[in-house]
A protein has these predicted regions:
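AAA+ ATPase active-site-proximal loops
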Residues: 132-143
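Short amphipathic alpha-helix used as the core "switch/output" element in two-component signaling
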Residues: 48, 70-82, 99
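C-terminal output helix
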Residues: 95, 112-122
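The feature encodes the CheY-like receiver
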Residues: 23, 65, 89, 93
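Active-site beta3 strand of CheY-like receiver
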Residues: 54-59, 64, 86
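Acidic, metal-coordinating helix/loop segments flanking the phosphotransfer/catalytic sites
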Residues: 39-57
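Acidic catalytic/metal-coordinating carboxylates
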Residues: 42, 68-71, 89
Length: 143
């Protein structure tokens, strides 16, 4: 279970998923872990909630009935650059994961993801990558 100190001073979390049962179950589990949860079942609902203020954390389903979850990721990233965003989907594909991360998602999980996995992904503090070498190795040198 997450400690409040791990979550930080702003425990706000937006959950966006059109599977109402999953959304409610995950919301209850995340509240028990110390998050202050807002729920949206569509891109449109998420946009309305974002107008009231962007959360510190978000979990967004990729495929929603009224659009693409990446639209929510993009809107959230514009509203709050430091938000930690996890994208969920039942349709795992590398290309989609790459697109989600390029748009600003912190992580990408396949459904069914449990609350512990989601919490770990939201709170993970990835290490920064080392800078590229000044003289990168060419493909010819690797042969």
């Amino acid at each position: 279970m997450a400690e409040d100190s791990e979550i930080g001073p702003d425990p706000s979390l937006l959950l966006v998923d059109d599977d109402e049962i999953f959304l409610n179950r995950l919301a209850r589990a995340m509240e028990k872990r110390g998050f202050l949860v807002s729920r949206a079942a569509s891109v449109a609902e998420a946009r309305v909630l974002l107008e009231g203020g962007a959360p510190a954390f978000a979990v967004v389903d990729l495929r929603l009935e009224d659009g693409n979850g990446l639209d929510v990721v993009d809107a959230l990233r514009e509203a709050r650059a430091d938000a930690r965003i996890v994208v969920l989907t039942g349709y795992g594909a590398i290309a989609t994961a790459v697109a989600a991360v390029k748009m600003g998602a912190t992580d990408y999980l396949s459904k069914p993801a449990d609350a512990d996995e989601v919490t770990r992904a939201l709170l993970a503090r990835g290490e920064t990558l080392p800078p590229p070498p000044e003289t990168p190795m060419s493909a010819d040198r690797v042969r």
